[in-house]
Amino acid sequence: MANKHLSLSLFLVLLGLSASLASGQVLFQGFNWESWKHNGGWYNFLMGKVDDIAAAGITHVWLPPASQSVAEQGYMPGRLYDLDASKYGNKAQLKSLIGALHGKGVKAIADIVINHRTAEHKDGRGIYCIFEGGTPDARLDWGPHMICRDDRPYADGTGNPDTGADFGAAPDIDHLNLRVQKELVEWLNWLKADIGFDGWRFDFAKGYSADVAKIYIDRSEPSFAVAEIWTSLAYGGDGKPNLNQDQHRQELVNWVDKVGGKGPATTFDFTTKGILNVAVEGELWRLRGTDGKAPGMIGWWPAKAVTFVDNHDTGSTQHMWPFPSDRVMQGYAYILTHPGTPCIFYDHFFDWGLKEEIDRLVSVRTRHGIHNESKLQIIEADADLYLAEIDGKVIVKLGPRYDVGNLIPGGFKVAAHGNDYAVWEKI
């Protein structure tokens, strides 16, 4: 009986440890918009960065789309099983990179682009809508009846209506078609079993319904999944975000809820991204919502929110929605001390000379067990000062104001600091 009690106790300890590790995730985007141009291949190049990535405390690396694509970056895929035609490298190099990550205890996340697909051949109408899967057999060899019926001119009118937003540059795939579902699930499971991927980042996830995403997640069982649902915030007449962004973050929460809140699904917290972009420009009061909590998705459902400063679209050479470049470390001081799962961008870590500063912040997060559901207490949120305490162990300050000594309780010491930010940790 004693042995049984001991075994049960050990099981509960390990279960708790497993849950703690799962919630302490730090994601890293391992590429930018120009990575495909790298001499010798990006997969080979990134192999040389694995030690630094693992040493930083990063738990997951998001890799670029791996399949053959008519766009060099991988976001216009065609032959999904063909991983040898990628501009980032070939299948063997990809597997070696994933093996190296696994050897350091880091998981690999695939960029899954399935909303749309480019065709290999024209049909009798002269329209490119005959797809080739990239295998000798008929897997993923589809025709126009696998295209959403309302996606003209590609469709032949036999498919189901689109369940999400239209993507104009390529045919929108009919995800209500049972063969489409079956063969995409098989492909996802092949990426796991044969290539070694552990989870998914769903590109343009607003292009198909959450019910569809649930099918792919439930039937492929990734350990981690994050969706890109990028929609516009609500803006006022001054061109700045409204104080209340509840409708915007509700869309993100609704997606996760429909996919299955108890599963691995998360979404990028575009609400926090948009607010933080403006807040660091002398409007730090924006970081306290009308309910006194964080104003983004992390204020409502932090366990399912992936926070970020920039990515290959918002930053890099595309600059669609860039974070103020001279305040990037304020952004990292925020996301790396707050609840939610933070995502670090390759450019900032390796190309901007910010590696040591980001390393220190991740170390503070790891050392004090800050995780995606940590308790956030906002102490001050004024134009020039944001001050918050996390789990009673870490305090973060953003903004140029320096007279905050009276707001920092005893028993804390400075753990990291830089341009208009500082972090204290409990001694």
UniProtKB/Swiss-Prot annotation:
Record-annotated site: Transition state stabilizer: 313
Entry EC number(s): 3.2.1.1
Annotated catalytic residues: 203 (nucleophile), 228 (proton donor)
Residues of the signal peptide: 1-24
GO biological process, one term: starch catabolic process
Gene Ontology MF terms in the entry: alpha-amylase activity; calcium ion binding
Cofactor note: Binds 3 Ca(2+) ions per subunit.
Pfam families for this protein: Alpha-amyl_C2, Alpha-amylase
Binding site for Ca(2+) 1: 115, 162, 165, 172, 207
Residues annotated to bind Ca(2+) 3: 151, 166-167, 170, 172
Keyword check for Metal-binding: yes
UniProt-annotated binding residues for Ca(2+) 2: 132, 135, 137, 141
Cofactor(s) required for function per UniProt: Ca(2+)
Catalytic activity: Endohydrolysis of (1->4)-alpha-D-glucosidic linkages in polysaccharides containing three or more (1->4)-alpha-linked D-glucose units
Domain of life of the source: Eukaryota
Subunit structure, as described in the record: Monomer.
Family named by the database record: Belongs to the glycosyl hydrolase 13 family.
Name of the protein described by the UniProt record: Alpha-amylase type B isozyme
